[in-house]
Curated annotation (Swiss-Prot):
Its main location: membrane. It is a peripheral membrane protein. InterPro entries: ATP_synth_F1_dsu/esu, ATP_synth_F1_dsu/esu_N, ATPsynth_dsu/esu_N. Keywords: ATP synthesis, Cell inner membrane, Cell membrane, CF(1), Hydrogen ion transport, Ion transport, Membrane, Transport. Gene3D superfamilies: F0F1 ATP synthase delta/epsilon subunit, N-terminal. GO terms for molecular function: ATP binding; proton-transporting ATP synthase activity, rotational mechanism. F-type ATPases have 2 components, CF(1) - the catalytic core - and CF(0) - the membrane proton channel. CF(1) has five subunits: alpha(3), beta(3), gamma(1), delta(1), epsilon(1). CF(0) has three main subunits: a, b and c. This is ATP synthase epsilon chain. It comes from Francisella tularensis subsp. holarctica (strain LVS). GO terms for cellular component: plasma membrane; proton-transporting ATP synthase complex. PANTHER family: ATP SYNTHASE DELTA/EPSILON CHAIN, ATP SYNTHASE EPSILON CHAIN, CHLOROPLASTIC. Disulfide bonds: none annotated.
Length: 145
C-alpha cells in the first residue's frame, strides 16, 4: 500500500510561502494543540502566533507563524497567515530584544491601552519566535521567566 501524505500549504498576502507534504502537522489552534494526519476530519480554526511542525518521515520543518487561520480537509492543510518564517531563519537576539521591549512597555504605568495591546501582541509573537527557534534546536522554551 502506498503511503498517503497530507498536502500542506502556508499562504500569506504575498502568496504561497511554504508548500510540502507531511505525515503529520502539529500546531496550536483555538481549541488547543492539534495533531493532523491524512484522513483527519474537516475543520476550520483560528491560530495564535505560534509554531507549526510539518513532519515527513524523520524530517520536521519548524515554522513560526504570526497567527491566522487553518483549514483542514482529509487530504490537505492550508494555513493562512500574515507572516511566516522558517525556524532556521529566525534571529534569537532580535526575538529576545523584541520580548524585552514589549515587557518594558507593559511595566510602564503610563502606557496607553493601545500601547499595552500592541505590546501584548509583540510579546506573544516574540515568545512564539523563541519557541520555534528553540524547538528546532531540540530545546524546550517556556515563556515564563
Amino acid at each position: 500500500m502506498t503511503k498517503k501524505y497530507l498536502k500542506v500549504d502556508v499562504v500569506s498576502p504575498l502568496g504561497s510561502v511554504f508548500k510540502g507534504e507531511a505525515d503529520m502537522v502539529s500546531l496550536r489552534g483555538s481549541a488547543g494543540e492539534m495533531g493532523i494526519v491524512y484522513g483527519h476530519t474537516e475543520l476550520l480554526s483560528t491560530l495564535p502566533a505560534g509554531v507549526v511542525n510539518v513532519r515527513k518521515g524523520q524530517h520536521t520543518d519548524v515554522l513560526y507563524v504570526s497567527g491566522g487561520i487553518v483549514e483542514v480537509t482529509p487530504t490537505r492543510v492550508t494555513i493562512m497567515v500574515d507572516d511566516m518564517e522558517r525556524a532556521e531563519n529566525l534571529n534569537q537576539a532580535e526575538a529576545e530584544k523584541a520580548r524585552a521591549r514589549a515587557k518594558e512597555v507593559l511595566k510602564n504605568p503610563d502606557a496607553s491601552k493601545l500601547d499595552i495591546e500592541a505590546a501584548n501582541k509583540r510579546l506573544k509573537e516574540a515568545d512564539a519566535r523563541l519557541k520555534a527557534l528553540n524547538s528546532s534546536n531540540g530545546l524546550y522554551y517556556s515563556k515564563d521567566d
